């Protein structure tokens, strides 16, 4: 059984806020989830092969094709405002400073 104090601790760690009257509800819900997990942990899976996918389909991938075209101008067309031309000249994105 997950206690009200444990629910409050989990909520604090997850930075969740909810009404005090919901603590009892979350306590019973989390306890039932933990009970289901305990049941699953009791199942013997030693001879079961791991499942990697529920469907046996391969992803269709296009072949890689090497091209000599320079796509940088198309890429830098996405830059907004006056810094677009400068970005095309120096070949990198100019962003606001985010670290002191």
From Swiss-Prot:
<keyword id="KW-0648">Protein biosynthesis</keyword>
<keyword id="KW-0436">Ligase</keyword>
<dbReference type="GO" id="GO:0006450">
    <property type="term" value="P:regulation of translational fidelity"/>
</dbReference>
<dbReference type="InterPro" id="IPR036113">
    <property type="entry name" value="Asp/Glu-ADT_sf_sub_c"/>
</dbReference>
<dbReference type="Pfam" id="PF02686">
    <property type="entry name" value="GatC"/>
</dbReference>
<comment type="subunit">
    <text>Heterotrimer of A, B and C subunits.</text>
</comment>
<dbReference type="GO" id="GO:0006412">
    <property type="term" value="P:translation"/>
</dbReference>
<dbReference type="GO" id="GO:0005524">
    <property type="term" value="F:ATP binding"/>
</dbReference>
<comment type="function">
    <text>Allows the formation of correctly charged Asn-tRNA(Asn) or Gln-tRNA(Gln) through the transamidation of misacylated Asp-tRNA(Asn) or Glu-tRNA(Gln) in organisms which lack either or both of asparaginyl-tRNA or glutaminyl-tRNA synthetases. The reaction takes place in the presence of glutamine and ATP through an activated phospho-Asp-tRNA(Asn) or phospho-Glu-tRNA(Gln).</text>
</comment>
<protein>
    <recommendedName>
        <fullName>Aspartyl/glutamyl-tRNA(Asn/Gln) amidotransferase subunit C</fullName>
        <ecNumber>6.3.5.-</ecNumber>
    </recommendedName>
</protein>
<comment type="similarity">
    <text>Belongs to the GatC family.</text>
</comment>
<keyword id="KW-0067">ATP-binding</keyword>
<dbReference type="GO" id="GO:0070681">
    <property type="term" value="P:glutaminyl-tRNAGln biosynthesis via transamidation"/>
</dbReference>
<keyword id="KW-0547">Nucleotide-binding</keyword>
<dbReference type="GO" id="GO:0050567">
    <property type="term" value="F:glutaminyl-tRNA synthase (glutamine-hydrolyzing) activity"/>
</dbReference>
<dbReference type="GO" id="GO:0050566">
    <property type="term" value="F:asparaginyl-tRNA synthase (glutamine-hydrolyzing) activity"/>
</dbReference>
<dbReference type="InterPro" id="IPR003837">
    <property type="entry name" value="GatC"/>
</dbReference>
């Amino acid at each position: 059984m997950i206690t009200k104090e444990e629910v409050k601790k989990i909520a604090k760690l997850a930075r969740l806020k909810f009404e005090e009257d919901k603590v009892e509800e979350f306590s019973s819900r989390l306890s039932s989830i933990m009970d289901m997990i305990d049941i699953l942990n009791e199942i013997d899976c030693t001879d079961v092969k791991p499942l990697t996918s529920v469907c046996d389909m391969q992803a269709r991938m296009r072949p890689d094709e090497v091209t000599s075209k320079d796509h940088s101008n198309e890429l830098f067309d996405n830059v907004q405002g006056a810094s677009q031309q400068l970005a095309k000249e120096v070949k990198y994105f100019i962003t606001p400073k985010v670290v002191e």
